[in-house]
Amino acid sequence: MTKRHVSLPPEAEEGVDAFITEVDQRLSSDEDVCGVVQDVLVDLFGDREAYERWQSGKPVSAATRVRLQGYDPCNATIESEYYAEKDETAFKKSKYLQWLWRQFDATPMADNVEFALRFRQMLAEHLFERVGDNCRFFKGISFTYGHNITVGDNTVIHDDVHLDDRGKLTIGDRVSLSDSAHLYSHDHDIVDQTAVENYHTIVDDDARVTYDAMVTAGSRVGKNSVVGAKAIVRGDVPDHHIAVGSPAKSVKVKPGWEDVAEPLEAGGENRKEERRIEYELPADLEVFDEFGRDFTPPSPSTSSSRTNSQ
């Protein structure tokens, strides 16, 4: 997409640069990450006066107290915190950084594109396994952890994209993920939903995953390929292919790449098992089943009696 250069007024640019540099330096230091996140959020939400009043022991309302406590990610839980197989060491830091990302997106500053893109790029450099240069991360992006995500150079991830890195996500150079796209790297057993299987999901260089499309766990979207709007990818999209529908099927090769692309029939190959990520849960880990379902199938006699009674 052809863009024009836009810049902030010099005074605004100076303020943005100073703030991002300060947060970056603090996150790169030996300072406690949880404390840094809390401190930054207190100021971003303009709550410094109320926070200092509370910290000094002066009375505050119950609503004010719970709001001020919420700036500290140690006082909050997020969904992925409950996942049994997560890497506890990696998650401890990524939770704090993910909290800062999410809460930043709830501030008015998140709509200042020049400021917000640079702030999120800086956060990604601390949160992701690896992130390239000149990426553009827009508002409302969500992750499972963040620390299992690799993103290449000049990649654009638009509003409300979900990046499930419960397994592993690799997103290449110059990739475009359109609004509301979903990339998954985990799946559930069809009978026992609590049994989780993790995979490596790949979106290769120059690929485009368009509006509201879904790439399921263990799939690969090939180089220079396009996934159509609302498509569901349940296998591999070969390089240079255009895939649409549910499940997504290759319907065309991008003009100009016909001589180097695989035939359309090659699309949809399921190589999920090659990308499985094995894990083991600690034997002493206390777990629970949130559904409490009974997985015992009915006996033949029970099924027969039900049929006869209808």
Language-model regions: role of each:
Residues 1-126, 251, 256-310:
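Terminal amphipathic alpha-helical/low-complexity segments used for targeting or macromolecular assembly
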Residues 130-251:
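Structural signal for interior beta-strand "rungs" in well-ordered beta-sheet cores
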